[in-house]
Amino acid sequence: MYKLVLIRHGESVWNQENRFTGWQDVDLSEKGRAEALKGGKALREKGFSFDVAYTSVLKRAIKTLNFVLDEVDQVWLPVHKDWRLNERHYGALQGLNKAETAARHGEEQVKIWRRSYDTPPPPMEVSDPRHPSHDPRYKNVDAQLLPSNESLKDTVARFLPLWDGTIAPAVKSGKNVLIVAHGNSLRALMQHLEGMTPDEIMGVNMPTGIPMMYELDANLKVLKKEFIGDPDEVKAAIEAVANQGKAK
């Protein structure tokens, strides 16, 4: 039996402002830092330790991982940062307030952009200085692979080669693996592990900063899944994520 722990980064400044964030490299909010520390403490109290960690190249995930590793007293742990664990690219929506966008375009359209499986939001122009092709952290990535927008289906296609080629073999080798990433890159993994349909994954909301543990069999099929935290707090956090795309 293998164990795999997933954590969505703590609340970011743009989560706090209810903005579409995507690949924009915004920092953790004060609440987000507290969430990361609390998540790490919960793991420590349950006796978790890890052999390797994976995260994205965005600071809100990297800093969350650092806080968690500090809490479990494993700041020395090997950490692999990979752009394929980035959040889904929200295209031209990045930076826009979700509630204002819902009021303008309708809640149903925003829900489709946020939660449908294969409908991407409007693309970001390549000439936009925020486009990843202008960001030095992606200078060694094939420009054809850098998105201007993504659906969840696109995010799955981007992430799965990293899972199949690197992370899954680490899990199968018996390593205790920690992944700290983003709502949609983690949903991509959840869909893959649990065999969810597009409709099923559309209804899944990942709370910020709360560790989720999978127990997996020899074929990486899910035996057990549970959040490491107070059940009422987990429920409230999931509902808060679900309500982000609604007009005020």
From Swiss-Prot:
Pfam family, one: His_Phos_1
Catalytic activity: (2R)-2-phosphoglycerate = (2R)-3-phosphoglycerate
EC number: 5.4.2.11
Site (Transition state stabilizer): residue numbering on this chain: 182
Binding site residues for substrate: 8-15, 21-22, 60, 87-90, 98, 114-115, 183-184
InterPro entries in the cross-refs: His_Pase_superF_clade-1, His_PPase_superfam, PG/BPGM_mutase_AS, Phosphogly_mut1
One function term, GO molecular function aspect: phosphoglycerate mutase activity
Catalytic center residues: 9 (tele-phosphohistidine intermediate), 87 (proton donor/acceptor)
Region (Disordered): 116-135
Domain of life: Bacteria
Known role: Catalyzes the interconversion of 2-phosphoglycerate and 3-phosphoglycerate.
Protein name according to UniProt: 2,3-bisphosphoglycerate-dependent phosphoglycerate mutase
Gene: gpmA
